[in-house]
Amino acid sequence: FVYNALCAATVGTLLGLSKEQIENGIKTFELTKKRMDITELKNGVTIINDSYNASFESMQASLKYLSGLNAKRKIAVLGDMFELGEYSKELHEKVGKEVVKNKIDILVCCGDSAKYIVNMAKKEGMPKEKVFYFDNKEQIEKFIRENAQNGDSVLFKASNGMKFFNIVENLIK
């Protein structure tokens, strides 16, 4: 955010805005919701809400980000990527490979196409006891409430239509 704010301030200066106008713009700026929103829960669990949209590339980037965190355990809660047409199976399987490549500790999935993520992660060597598939969001919420621990980071990533943001909102309450 800092680098983006500096760039915006520079552009504002070039366009003739006053320092007060630039400062006010930066103070009142709000990031887009459901895109890498980070919240720390009272129990010490970090929630990363990236549930606004999902493509293979954004899944890949989010998993890479999660893998780089200094967390006790890295938990990826992944759902379907919509609008992939004939490439859906292939791209969901590639996400499963990315989960293993990025050394995610626990994989939690929901959605018809997310089954391909689960199957490929297992095929690529992720231990079966670290991979969970649920039929609905309520089961995911219950699982995270009961299993996420102090120091864990939990990424929520799916197409907006999966409504994973509802899980995040319930966990934050």
Describe each PLM feature range.
Residues 7-173:
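ATP-dependent carboxylate-amine ligase
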